[in-house]
């Protein structure tokens, strides 16, 4: 196939560094992921390859240059997101992901959505009392939920954060683990702790938990309570029974928000027990202040090496089947 060439004019020599990063790591990433060759010379970027691949590279570079021209720092996750969006024919919406900063993490780094699915999710939480986030692992559901909860707490919109999940895990009975129920469920809430530590830092998280402003508890602890002025997150909701889900949702109090996250492809309940998450989708879809946001594989933005590992395993599986 005939090789195509595109020249892209930059506005300033410094743009090359801001665009491609130290040691041109972003340039190499674009070459690898888009199957093109890129030559960067002062204020001209030349892209070589098949016409469609060159066009994708041009769109990625121009989208990233919008961020550069706004004085924003372009990091590897931004490049990965742009590449993912151009492959999904969504690059025209890339810049909209950067219109709003949700909050800064404990190092001062801004936290923003990374995919259109994440943007829909954040917008839904702002507009609804109860938001269900349904989709595969790695889509950022837990991290975003905790981020939105901390943001609401810092703005004085709620007085406390409550994080919970059902005590069910694949192939493992919690009845055989030592300690009380809270101690048993805590190891399975690790993603929640990780998110809190990244956003608030470990010390502030610990202080807020000691003051019971942040509460991390098993789902069983929610029974009989009415949760006013609270931001309540239920994680791993696919493993709730119908009665557990009903019990949880009816805890909603005044001036509160609820997020229910789960992945219906990873249900660990006994085969004859219907998931409360699937049941809720069917029963609650027409309630005005409840919204369902569905994530897909497009919302998984892995590290470039992880993306290559996944592809290698997929290729290996295909070869094995041939």
Per-range role (PLM):
Residues 1-18:
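Short glycine-/aliphatic-rich beta-strand segments at the starts of folded cytosolic domains
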Residues 19, 57-60, 245:
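Hydrophobic side chains in well-ordered alpha-helices
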Residues 39-98:
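Interdomain "pre-motor" coupling segment immediately N-terminal to P-loop NTPase/helicase cores
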Residues 44, 106-234, 238-322:
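Conserved helicase motor core of SF1/SF2 NTP-dependent helicases
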């Amino acid at each position: 196939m005939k090789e195509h060439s595109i020249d892209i004019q930059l506005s300033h020599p410094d743009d090359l560094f801001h665009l491609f990063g130290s040691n041109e790591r972003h340039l190499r990433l674009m070459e690898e992921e888009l199957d093109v060759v890129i030559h960067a010379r002062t204020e001209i970027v030349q892209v070589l390859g098949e016409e469609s691949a060159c066009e994708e590279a041009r769109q990625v570079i121009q989208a990233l240059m919008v961020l550069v021209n706004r004085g924003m720092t372009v990091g590897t996750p931004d490049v990965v997101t742009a590449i993912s969006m151009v492959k999904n024919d969504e690059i025209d919406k890339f810049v909209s992901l950067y219109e709003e900063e949700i909050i800064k993490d404990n190092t001062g780094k801004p936290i923003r959505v990374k995919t259109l699915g994440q943007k829909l999710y954040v917008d839904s939480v702002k507009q609804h009392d109860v938001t269900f986030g349904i989709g595969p692992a790695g889509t950022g559901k837990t991290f975003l939920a905790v981020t939105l909860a901390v943001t609401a707490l810092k703005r004085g919109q709620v007085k406390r954060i409550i994080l919970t999940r059902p005590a069910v895990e694949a192939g493992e009975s919690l009845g055989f683990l030592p300690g009380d129920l809270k101690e048993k469920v805590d190891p399975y809430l690790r993603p929640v702790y990780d998110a809190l530590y990244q956003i608030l830092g470990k010390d502030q998280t610990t202080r807020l938990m000691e003051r019971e402003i942040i509460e991390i508890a098993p789902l069983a602890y929610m029974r009989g309570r009415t949760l006013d002025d609270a931001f309540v997150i239920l994680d791993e909701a696919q493993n709730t029974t119908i009665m557990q889900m009903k019990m949880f949702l009816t805890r909603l109090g005044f001036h509160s928000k609820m997020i229910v996250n789960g992945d219906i492809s990873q249900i660990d309940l006994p085969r004859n027990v219907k998931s409360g998450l699937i049941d809720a989708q069917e029963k609650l879809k027409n309630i005005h202040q409840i919204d369902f946001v569905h994530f897909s594989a497009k919302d998984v933005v892995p590290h470039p090496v992880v993306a290559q590992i996944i592809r290698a395993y997929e290729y290996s599986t295909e070869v094995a089947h041939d």
